[in-house]
């Protein structure tokens, strides 16, 4: 199974929590990490199979937009193992 990483960045905490909740409920993904970037920007990262991550990011983006400010969302299908290690700090971030 090929894994993907999905990211949603919001301005403000409430939108980020709403996004993470919608992501977890919409598809079979795991919420891997949240990152407080600064200036009120927060990113939530999920992982799972490509189709599930795409569905989760779509649902999370819509949910975040309803209660806060969606800044960006993106899905990386089949990320390189080194990239996942560098950005997520997790050697098991991507399963091949």
Identify the residue ranges that each predicted region occupies.
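Terminal helix-to-tail segments of small alpha-helical proteins
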Residues: 1-96
């Amino acid at each position: 199974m090929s894994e993907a990483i999905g990211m949603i960045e919001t301005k403000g905490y409430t939108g980020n929590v709403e996004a993470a909740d919608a992501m977890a409920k919409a598809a079979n993904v795991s919420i891997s990490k949240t990152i407080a970037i600064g200036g009120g920007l927060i990113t939530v990262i999920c992982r799972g199979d490509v189709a599930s991550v795409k569905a989760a990011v779509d649902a999370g983006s819509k949910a975040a937009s309803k209660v806060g400010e969606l800044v960006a969302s993106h899905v990386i299908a089949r990320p390189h193992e080194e990239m996942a290690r560098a950005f997520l700090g997790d050697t098991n971030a991507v399963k091949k």
